């Protein structure tokens, strides 16, 4: 693939060198050319910082670090849009949208950083900072029960399916005493979706992966998207009664 500067809804358009088809970066799909309608698989990815990744994966086998590309004139140590880590007057924090949009969705601040997720053909944009503040957020995408958990070691939001075993009601989770607990059994879970203590020890949840985007770009490309926070989030009142956990429906 390569980019020649063309944009659609303020999002990069890619060209594959084999057929010349045009691809949407945010959809991961060809929208024009011989491969029109062809999609790419999403691979697991976390947008984190090097210092966190280095610590978490230090002891892991088969970990590779990509080398900075050589040649050319691009400085890969400098972000041309400023720094998303430092509050101030830069592209990550101000209201500028440099290129035209077909629509601007007002449900979130345009520069809100979201994880855009598709589950069973339902789309949802998840506010990463909302998950960071709440620690644990139970929600639905269509009829699929999900939970977003803040992984403090990587400083990322991770999304899991709350259906642990077939035939049983989906679990509900809460943040209590600095730990992730399911409210039915009070078992303790980690941010990797694994139960590490209690009646459900050894159980695990399936993780879902999406794409990282600004809200304005995700919503412009996917106007039918739901949101977190929003109506899909399980209310806090439902988390106060363990015997009601299996009765919470979208």
Q: Language-model features: where?
A:
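Mid-to-C-terminal functional-domain signal that highlights helix-capping/loop sites
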Residues: 1-250
